[in-house]
Curated annotation (Swiss-Prot):
Species in which this protein is naturally found: Herpetosiphon aurantiacus (strain ATCC 23779 / DSM 785 / 114-95)
NCBIfam families attached to this UniProt entry: Q_tRNA_tgt, tgt_general
Cofactor requirements of the protein: Zn(2+)
Family, per entry: Belongs to the queuine tRNA-ribosyltransferase family.
Protein name: Queuine tRNA-ribosyltransferase
Catalytic activity entry: 7-aminomethyl-7-carbaguanine + guanosine(34) in tRNA = 7-aminomethyl-7-carbaguanosine(34) in tRNA + guanine
Matches recorded under InterPro entries: ArchSynthase1/Queuine_TRR (IPR050076), TGT (IPR004803), TGT-like_sf (IPR036511), tRNA_ribo_trans-like (IPR002616)
GO BP annotation list: queuosine biosynthetic process; tRNA wobble guanine modification; tRNA-guanine transglycosylation
Length: 392
């Protein structure tokens, strides 16, 4: 615990500006964390990831356990040395992937038996093994093994999954041996307000230096997700960081910050970038659109990323049409910087007691994606991951 301290610098309503210290550096919050599923942020060199202002990145326990293995990563000196990333790293527990990518997963009180989405081989995770794997990987922040109940489901099943998550957290705490890693507990409870409150109260009582909020942004409407945050965050300790897991659209980041969330991660900006969809203040720009073929303007004239400072929309469209790898890299770099900068601006607004007006002004210009469109895309991605392997 001595290696990890959270300082709440200032609050503006429920929005918080803080600092979380780790052995590999101090993280200023609110913060967006790029996802490096396979110990790499897809298409980018770690130096580029650092240059766009990334303070911390996330890697995935499930995928690294399968390839190249936690033992190999440990043999290579741990994740930081393996991937040459000098700043903090967070690893998830693998629970979400076990339940979402493994349709044949079998859950019991001790753990989960599942089949690899790569070759169908059988594996088993328990709270103890999930902690052991993450200790070998060596991230600064590790997550408790939890059960993310599928949605929609019954109140009874959601309650059972939540209670199992609580019991598993106690086992994770008992199994943890490394003092240089911070173990976060995870609030569950689906979209049931009473369960969210119960879970938040339970996790808040545990001796963990930070708290994740899981099981959201898995198919429910945004308004429901925001409502669950409003049930959850008021019950969490003010002296610990709150991490909303797997959430990364610009509007969700701002709405999450307004409800007291400090940390976010998502593959959305990198995935969208590789598919030619770029964030701009008005929403998303599809670079494949023919109208950009002769447009000499940058993707976003207000953006300070090297893509926008150097290249035109016409050039990026050309790169995507000719399937040049540089196009994927430039789009990924822009999207990540867009979200990182958004959180920098949010932090500044909080410190100046103007967060609500900042958010209202920003969201008044940004066009969001309809729920039905998002859900169709999410379902297609999950099906692809289950049948073809991860391309996140």
């Amino acid at each position: 615990m001595n290696n990890f301290t959270y300082t709440l610098e200032h609050s503006d309503g429920e929005a918080r500006a803080g600092q979380f210290s780790t052995p590999h550096g101090t993280i200023q919050t609110p913060v967006f964390m790029p996802v490096g599923t396979q110990a790499t942020v897809k298409t980018l060199d770690p130096l580029e990831v650092e240059a766009i202002g990334s303070q911390i990145i996330l890697s995935n326990t499930y995928h690294l356990y399968l390839r190249p293995s936690a033992d190999l990563v440990a043999e290579m000196g741990g994740l930081h040395r393996f991937m040459q990333w000098p700043k903090p790293i967070l690893t998830d527990s693998g629970g979400f992937q076990v339940f979402s990518l493994g349709p044949h997963s079998k859950i019991d009180e001790d753990g989960v038996t599942f089949k690899s989405h790569i070759d169908g081989s059988k594996h088993r995770f328990t709270p103890e093994s999930a902690i052991g794997i993450q200790e070998k990987l060596g991230a600064d922040i590790i997550m408790a093994f939890d059960e993310c109940a599928p949605q929609p489901t019954t109140h009874a099943y959601t309650k059972a999954a939540m209670e199992r998550t609580h019991r598993w957290l106690l086992r994770c705490i008992a199994a943890k041996t490394r003092a240089d890693q911070a173990l976060f507990g995870i609030v569950q409870g689906g979209v049931e307000a009473d369960l969210r409150r119960e879970s938040a109260s339970f996790i808040a009582q545990q001796d963990v230096p930070g708290i994740g909020i899981g099981g959201l942004s898995v198919g429910e409407p945004k308004e429901q997700m925001y409502g669950m945050l409003e049930e959850t965050t008021p019950l969490l300790p003010r002296n610990k960081p709150r991490y909303l897991m797997g959430v990364g659209s610009p509007e969700d980041l701002l709405e999450g910050v307004a409800r007291g969330v400090d940390m976010f991660d998502c593959v959305l900006p990198t995935r969208l970038g590789r598919n030619g969809a770029l964030f701009i203040p008005e929403g998303r720009l599809n670079i494949g659109n023919a109208k950009y073929a002769r447009e000499d303007a940058p993707i976003d004239a207000t953006c300070d990323c090297s893509t926008c400072q150097r290249f035109s929309r016409a050039y990026l469209r050309h790169l995507f049409r000719t399937e040049e790898v540089l196009g994927l890299r430039l789009a990924t770099l822009h999207n990540l910087r867009f979200l990182i900068r958004l959180m920098e601006q949010a932090r500044e607004a909080i410190l100046q007691d103007r967060y609500q007006s900042f958010m209202d002004d920003w969201l008044s210009r940004f066009q969001t994606i309809p729920h039905a469109v998002r859900e169709a895309s999410r379902a297609a991605r999950l099906n692809s991951l289950r049948t073809q392997g991860d391309k996140a």
